[in-house]
Amino acid sequence: PAYIHMYDVLKGLQKGGSFLLNSIWDEEETKKHLPNHMKRYLAENEINFYIINGTKTGQELGLGNRTNTIMQSAFFKITNVIPYEVAVSEMKHAIDKSYGKKGEAIVNMNYAAVDAGGKEGNLIKVTVPAEWKNLPDDEIKHDENRPEFIRNIVDVMNAQKGDDLPVSAFNGYEDGTFPAGTAKFEKRGIAVNVPEWQVENCIQCNQCAYVCPHAAIRPFLMSDEELAAAPAGTQAKPAIGKELAGYKFRIQVSPLDCTGCGNCADVCPAKTKALVMRPLESQMVEENRWEYMDKKVGYKKIVEPNNVKNSQFTQPLFEFSGACAGCGETPYIKLISQLFGERMMVANATGCSSIYGGSAPSTPYCTNYESGRGPAWANSLF
């Protein structure tokens, strides 16, 4: 549901059309989260509004975060562009063709996803009150601390409204270069669940930060004074290692930058896991702590980055990219940026790395807070 605040998802939907939303909430809670302009459009255009918790259903069926089959089935149930029974039959035939060699269990799991998408009780038609027609637009809060480039160009383009930008908006950017480190301003909040640090279980190996595809979980070293000045409730423990004597150790998550892949929790080698996946909304208190750790505590060069643990105390110069949740490529780029980023030049070959590395206007390559240096990146299609 984060996307309903990012994009105009109803744009182009004609009067009497149908809108299907994958929502983690029930009908009443979903209504509370919809922005007013969206409610007004639904009412004015007599839209048939449906919700389904494809996320929960996919997890219950063993499909993890995959919802596409569930949503496709729900689409056919709602639209009736072809008889639903025919759609189900064709989808299951495609499943046999695609997954038959992977075994009966995988096939049946996907069969169940098809059936779940059109099942009564899963697919819910939402009542659209007539009074929604009179709702005013929500008050838009402008953060004047956001750089001008972000407010005037990045935010507009990320909302899929780049065609609305006048040529004059690009004054100063005539050569096609964009500033580095713009991805950190997106704060997409797309995860359903994010990791919660269990301080008492942590063995301080930093493997969670090492495998994170988006640099959304990091270790920090604090002095007693820094810990005392941290937001209320901030937990830490004495850092392990003679070089780190006197410092306090903390693992910090950026909930709005996390994609919820769970790689960190999976890799945690502690006897009792030091990371437990929790609903995003329950972890929003961590956002202020993230800002404090990243901006105020910073990245201390106390130890040489000569092993996995030590490398993760270094600031990543590749962060919050648009890579898929759980990506296996980006942790390598992130690590290279931690080791050599201040003197890196990247001539990128086209592929996934060009998409998550520089989909205009977002740039995950950033600069070191101390030196202002970071990777220079360019990509040529040919």
Each language-model region and where it sits:
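Active-site cofactor/cluster-binding pocket
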Residues: 1-155, 228-232, 236
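Ferredoxin-type iron-sulfur electron-transfer modules and their immediate structural context
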Residues: 87-91, 100-257, 265-382
